[in-house]
Amino acid sequence: MILVFLGPPGAGKGTQAKRLAKEKGFVHISTGDILREAVQKGTPLGKKAKEYMERGELVPDDLIIALIEEVFPKHGNVIFDGFPRTVKQAEALDEMLEKKGLKVDHVLLFEVPDEVVIERLSGRRINPETGEVYHVKYNPPPPGVKVIQREDDKPEVIKKRLEVYREQTAPLIEYYKKKGILRIIDASKPVEEVYRQVLEVIGDGN
């Protein structure tokens, strides 16, 4: 089964994807992670991607697809998280899957009001040494632990990220709606409740 997780930053896509990976054996493909890993390892594709990133440019679609092909499992269930972001990427992904005799089964759109996203993200704090993520309201850091707020998590930056997300993703939502595979998840609910909705969509995950 192939799933695509769509939704604004702070919708909890990563949390749900990690849980499905752990409990149902899905392979979680996060393009952010595979890009960082390829760049760190200095693979040929990673070196190419790094050139674009250093210039502050978007990594081209064909390069991202090539990176995905490298980590795509021979068989099993897969979640794409943070990809595709555009219709062009969705078409490229469909083409890649078709060659393997596969297709996207469900696209889960994690819907959450802006004010919830802003509260979730602007409260996030990170321990720069361990990468551990905390939240001032929901999961405060233990006393004495030094934490920082990422630039990305400042309210004015979050608003901009939400605007960009909307512009980019609206056509993509239409694309998957037309295919009849778009499923809406109410991501403003507590984590457990969101997970229950995800399981309802995918059945037992086979």
Swiss-Prot record:
Pfam families listed in its UniProt record: ADK
Keywords: ATP-binding, Cytoplasm, Kinase, Nucleotide biosynthesis, Nucleotide-binding, Transferase
Residue numbers spanned by region LID: 123-153
Pathway: Purine metabolism; AMP biosynthesis via salvage pathway; AMP from ADP: step 1/1
Binding residues annotated for AMP, in chain numbering: 31, 57-59, 82-85, 89, 161
An annotated Gene Ontology molecular function: adenylate kinase activity
UniProt family annotation: Belongs to the adenylate kinase family.
Protein name as it appears in the record: Adenylate kinase
Organism: Aquifex aeolicus (strain VF5)
Upper lineage: Bacteria, Pseudomonadati, Aquificota, Aquificia, Aquificales
